[in-house]
């Protein structure tokens, strides 16, 4: 008799514990196929996500695409940088160079640099300080500042 009571009690506890939990049943009728997005659909999603103050999650939901996939497409299109939400960096470009025909011309350039007064640049960003002494071209100083700002 105890055995029947224990069984009935166990069954009642099981039903009470799981009551109301299983309301949705999904029937899989065949193999799941990946969705292939056309270039036009991708372009439309990318255009909407490039708008200022665009809600990427809402755009992804509206088109039925995963937000991570949309961000992957945005990164590939250059809309965002390697870190989520970071603006894309400028595309690499060639730097013009000048080839000296004469060795003396090269030595004259080096002598001109050495004759100039030594400069000092202090760069203070985000609580850190960097001091650069000597002659620094404005382009190099600009590149250093932009690189330091990009790490924030």
Swiss-Prot record:
ATP-binding is among the record's keywords: no
Keywords from the named record: Plasmid
| Pfam families in the cross-refs | HTH_Tnp_1 (PF01527)
Where does the source fall among the domains of life?
Bacteria
A GO BP entry is: DNA transposition
InterPro entries attached to this UniProt entry: Transposase_8, Trp_repressor/repl_initiator
GO molecular-function terms, A-Z: sequence-specific DNA binding; transposase activity
Matching SUPFAM superfamilies, A to Z? Answer: TrpR-like
Which family is this sequence assigned to? Belongs to the transposase 8 family.
Any idea what this protein is called? Uncharacterized protein y4jB
* Biological classification of the source: Bacteria, Pseudomonadati, Pseudomonadota, Alphaproteobacteria, Hyphomicrobiales
């Amino acid at each position: 008799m105890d055995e029947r009571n224990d069984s009935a009690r166990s069954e009642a506890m099981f039903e009470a514990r799981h009551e109301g939990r299983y309301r949705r049943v999904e029937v899989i009728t065949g193999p799941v196929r990946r969705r292939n997005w056309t270039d036009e659909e991708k372009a439309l999603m990318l255009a909407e996500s490039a708008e200022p103050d665009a809600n990427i999650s809402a755009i992804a939901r509206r088109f039925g695409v995963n937000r991570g996939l949309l961000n992957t497409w945005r990164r590939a299109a250059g809309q965002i940088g390697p870190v989520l939400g970071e603006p894309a960096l400028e595309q690499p470009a060639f730097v013009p160079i000048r080839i000296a025909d004469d060795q003396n011309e090269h030595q004259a350039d080096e002598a001109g640099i050495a004759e100039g007064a030594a400069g000092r640049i202090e760069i203070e960003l985000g609580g850190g300080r960097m001091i650069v002494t000597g002659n620094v071209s404005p382009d190099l100083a600009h590149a250093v500042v932009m690189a330091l700002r990009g790490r924030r």
